[in-house]
């Protein structure tokens, strides 16, 4: 069973959310029932997939790392990176196993999202932004079932704020209406539209030929957008019904005027996570230590590190790594043009130039997804 896919899941979700809606409309706290519902849904989904034991071990591992790191009397940088490596260790084994099939040790749906949540907690503890951990709230955050398989990647402090300030009856009515709308819209997007594209566009194309490949590029781009945005919308909508307001993951990405603008609109929770916890940390540390004679070098290398991490986050297969290389080059080129080409800055924000830049950005990203799909390899 896959979350937000299949009649059985939606039937169970409907039954599970009904008590939450009643509690919310009565102005009662939702997080205790939310924890119960998350545990029940995770047991059902992962038991059916044969991954329940792997999920339990993974969860205990990440919880132990976060709690033990918080208890350390002195948290040094080497200890931080050791904790981060250990937190990402299971994910690395899973990704390596996908390359070395059939020698995979284990598989776990949603490991990428759960790992990044745990790493974020470790980094926030080290930076002093988390003074204490509440184990039950941390466990709820790590295993919040609507976001387990497709995100968004929430932030612990924001999640905790929702738990500490539950919606009153009036606010919950608004969340209920928005949540139902997001669930319905996401279902149409992920199930109906993307399913139609897959069956009647992509599946009908021959496997070779320039025209077929070009058509596949466009079809795959729209398929992935409607599929991924739809799943994100359903996850966010379900969260609303449980009183958790997860961040938006898409904001009209195909209206972007350049690639930097695009990555502020597509898979927003992942791109901002990488920006805040990888790119910014690398650049600020490099500038502070004066690692490079040209300060811009730190920014360029930060983009390379950022986009390569994004590629590897999807998998270690060649197409994902090439996808990271491709977007590294695009982001660096974007930075150079922004810094040294005044006509470009003006061109992309006015009239016909803006339209041209939107079309170019769309095609640059679509070609990147063609690489990502593995069709060119």
State each model region's role:
Residues 1-377:
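Membrane-embedded transmembrane alpha-helical bundles that form the catalytic cores
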């Amino acid at each position: 069973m896959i979350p937000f896919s299949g009649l059985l899941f939606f039937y169970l979700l409907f039954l599970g959310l009904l008590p939450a809606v009643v509690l919310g409309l009565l102005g009662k706290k939702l997080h205790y029932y939310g924890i119960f519902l998350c545990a029940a849904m995770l047991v059902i989904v992962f038991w059916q997939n044969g991954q329940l034991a792997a999920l339990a071990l993974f969860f205990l591992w990440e919880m132990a790392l976060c709690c033990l790191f918080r208890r350390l009397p002195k948290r040094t940088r080497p200890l931080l990176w050791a904790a981060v490596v250990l937190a990402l260790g299971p994910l690395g084994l899973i990704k390596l196993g996908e390359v070395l099939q059939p020698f995979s040790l284990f598989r776990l749906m949603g490991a990428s999202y759960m790992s990044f949540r745990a790493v974020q907690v470790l980094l926030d503890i080290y930076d002093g932004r988390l003074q204490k951990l509440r184990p039950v709230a941390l466990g709820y955050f790590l295993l919040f079932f609507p976001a387990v398989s497709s995100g968004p990647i929430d932030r612990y402090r924001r999640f905790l704020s929702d738990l500490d300030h539950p919606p009153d009856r009036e606010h919950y009515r608004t969340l209920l209406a928005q949540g139902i709308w997001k669930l319905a819209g996401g279902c149409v997007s992920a199930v109906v539209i993307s399913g139609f594209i897959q069956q009647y566009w992509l599946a009908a194309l021959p496997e070779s030929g320039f025209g077929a490949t070009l058509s596949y590029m466009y079809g795959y781009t729209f398929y992935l957008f409607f599929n991924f945005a739809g799943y994100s919308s359903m996850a966010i909508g379900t969260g609303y019904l449980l009183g958790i307001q997860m961040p938006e993951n898409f904001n009209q990405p195909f209206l972007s005027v350049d690639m930097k603008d695009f990555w502020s609109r597509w898979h927003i929770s992942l791109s901002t996570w990488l920006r805040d916890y990888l790119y910014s940390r690398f650049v600020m540390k490099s500038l502070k230590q004066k690692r490079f004679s040209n300060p811009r070098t730190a920014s360029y290398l930060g983009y390379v590190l950022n986009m390569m991490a994004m590629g590897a986050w999807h998998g270690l297969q060649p197409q994902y790594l090439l996808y990271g290389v491709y977007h590294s080059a695009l982001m660096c080129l974007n930075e150079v043009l922004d810094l040294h080409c005044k006509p470009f800055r003006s061109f992309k924000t006015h009239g016909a130039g803006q339209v041209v830049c939107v079309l170019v950005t769309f095609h640059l990203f679509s070609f990147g997804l063609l690489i990502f799909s593995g069709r060119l390899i």
